[in-house]
């Protein structure tokens, strides 16, 4: 059998199937299997840390062919390695195979299986397996229940998860901080913060002291739900209980404050970190740089950027892009380009967001040609433009009167639909607005017709753009006809549509019609 295993891998290597074959050096390492009569126990003891998936499957095959059969303990060691590779369905199938062969599970194997059911989004199977475990005489422990409850959380079955916690307590199994932390973290990551807080209170009632990991999970969850005030209160309660926050705890709240426009609070938290001798990391600095940029304080953002380097925290592409974005928003595109070049000199390549930010920046200062050069540079470097890149570039070209170039870019997008950059409704709206803005109504109507042929979901924004274009071109009668047809299309005019139409009527001297439409707008409750 061992020789057959060895020969199998040698054949794979000879055939050039390097993806499935073991490396030659690894093959030589495995030759001791033959010399030592395939001592799988030695392999289990020494070789699992570097085992690849295909190797693990081959080892399992070898083990089931061995006589006498290995113990369930040995099999479980291997199954645990496969589970760590996130091959949960494979573990479940291999366990079924063992049962068919008459190899009985132990509690550790049952817990491993329970976890695999849950991680592969099959909590209903995990729940029924719990009953099977108990029939086999295994008493579920805290590991069993932690896996099962976590599985219910991952499957958004919150009532069952909470019920399982109560059932566990009734069975005399005392929850510990690890179990609560695992479940609370899962709840927070899936947006069930209220359930997490309820569980947190329950834990306190059982006299279990929370740790920094649990607090950080809750702070993160609250911040992600927009409840930064509650997160801040939780942080204060944490410090009062002499539980020291870590950099991840502070980062969650600093980032939340920045996004809420509470930059002074974010700065105060940063200063508090320093006072507590908690070293900021790149995420901390990047959040603060974003905050300075949002406040228009780009010089302070740059100072923070260089302070980061002096602290041994070297900026990555995200940090550079944040600073570039700040300068672009302040229309200091030359400074933004200097930062971009500095980033390149340090061996960092801008990503799609970096280039899109620069394209938008040059568009806003009326430099469409430079924006297009940046786009060309992006493509030549192999950085893939996404739909937002194209939309930003189209807006830049149209806004600056480069309609022909915009149409060329649009046609390029249509050709590259298979690359995942097909025009979306926003692309069409940008182009339609640009064409109408530049007096190209006929071309706009052709593009609009293309949208209809593609059976796109045309909404009120698109119709309003066309109505505005018609009014601008003096085609008010056409605009009125299109406006009146909206109800039959299932589209309701908004205040912008009404205002556009009323203004168009006034410009044509149709004051009575404009007043009638104004009254209708009021009657329809549009404001």
Curated annotation (Swiss-Prot):
Its main location: mitochondrion. The keyword Repeat applies. It comes from Arabidopsis thaliana (Mouse-ear cress). Transmembrane segments: none annotated. One of its GO terms (cellular component) is mitochondrion. Keywords: Mitochondrion, Repeat, Transit peptide. Signal peptide: none annotated. It comes from the Eukaryota. It is found in: Mitochondrion. This is Pentatricopeptide repeat-containing protein At5g41170, mitochondrial.
């Amino acid at each position: 059998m061992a020789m057959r295993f060895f020969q199998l891998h040698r054949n794979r290597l000879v055939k050039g199937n390097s993806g499935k074959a073991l490396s030659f050096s690894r093959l030589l390492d495995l030759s001791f299997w033959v010399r030592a009569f395939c001592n799988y126990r030695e392999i289990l003891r020494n070789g699992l840390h570097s085992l690849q998936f295909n190797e693990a499957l081959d080892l399992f095959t070898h083990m089931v062919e061995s006589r006498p059969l290995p113990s369930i303990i040995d099999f479980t060691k291997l199954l645990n390695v496969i589970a760590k590779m996130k091959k949960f369905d494979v573990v479940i199938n291999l366990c079924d195979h063992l049962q068919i062969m008459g190899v009985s599970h132990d509690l550790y194997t049952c817990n491993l299986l329970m976890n695999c059911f849950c991680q592969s989004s099959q909590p209903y199977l995990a729940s029924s397996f719990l009953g099977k475990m108990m029939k086999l005489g295994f008493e579920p422990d805290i590991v069993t229940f932690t896996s099962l409850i976590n599985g219910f959380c991952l499957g958004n079955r919150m009532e069952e998860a909470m019920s399982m916690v109560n059932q566990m307590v009734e069975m005399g199994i005392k929850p510990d901080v690890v179990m609560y932390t695992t479940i609370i973290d899962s709840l927070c990551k899936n947006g069930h913060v209220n359930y997490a807080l309820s569980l947190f209170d329950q834990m306190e009632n059982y006299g279990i002291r929370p740790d920094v990991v649990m607090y950080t999970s809750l702070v993160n969850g609250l911040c992600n739900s927009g409840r930064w005030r509650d997160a801040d209160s939780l942080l204060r309660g944490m410090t009062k209980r002499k539980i020291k926050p870590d950099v991840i705890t502070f980062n969650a709240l600093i980032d939340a404050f920045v996004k809420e426009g509470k930059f002074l609070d974010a700065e105060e938290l940063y200063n508090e970190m320093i006072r507590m001798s908690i070293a900021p990391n790149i995420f901390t600095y990047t959040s603060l740089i974003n905050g300075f940029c949002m406040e228009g304080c780009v010089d302070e953002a740059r100072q923070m950027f260089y302070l980061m380097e002096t602290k041994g925290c070297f900026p990555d592409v995200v940090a550079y892009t944040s600073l570039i974005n700040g300068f672009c928003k302040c229309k200091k595109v030359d400074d933004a380009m200097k930062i971009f070049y500095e980033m390149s000199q340090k061996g960092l390549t801008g990503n799609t967001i970096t280039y899109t930010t620069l394209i938008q920046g040059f568009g806003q200062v009326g430099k469409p040609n430079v924006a297009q050069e940046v786009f060309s540079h992006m493509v030549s470097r192999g950085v893939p433009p996404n739909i937002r890149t194209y939309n930003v570039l189209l807006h830049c070209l149209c806004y600056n009167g480069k309609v022909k170039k915009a149409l060329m870019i649009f046609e390029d997008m249509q050709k590259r639909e298979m690359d995942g950059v097909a025009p979306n409704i926003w692309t069409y709206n940008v182009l339609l607005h640009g064409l109408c803005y530049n007096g190209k109504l006929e071309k706009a109507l052709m593009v609009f017709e293309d949208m209809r042929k593609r059976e796109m979901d045309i909404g009120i924004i698109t119709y309003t753009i066309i109505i505005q274009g018609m009014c601008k071109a003096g085609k008010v009668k056409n605009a009125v006809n299109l406006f009146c047809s909206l109800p039959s299309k299932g589209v309701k005019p908004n205040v912008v549509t009404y205002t556009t139409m009323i203004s168009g009527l006034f410009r044509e001297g149709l004051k009575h019609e404009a007043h009638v439409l104004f009254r209708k707008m009021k009657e329809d409750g549009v404001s």
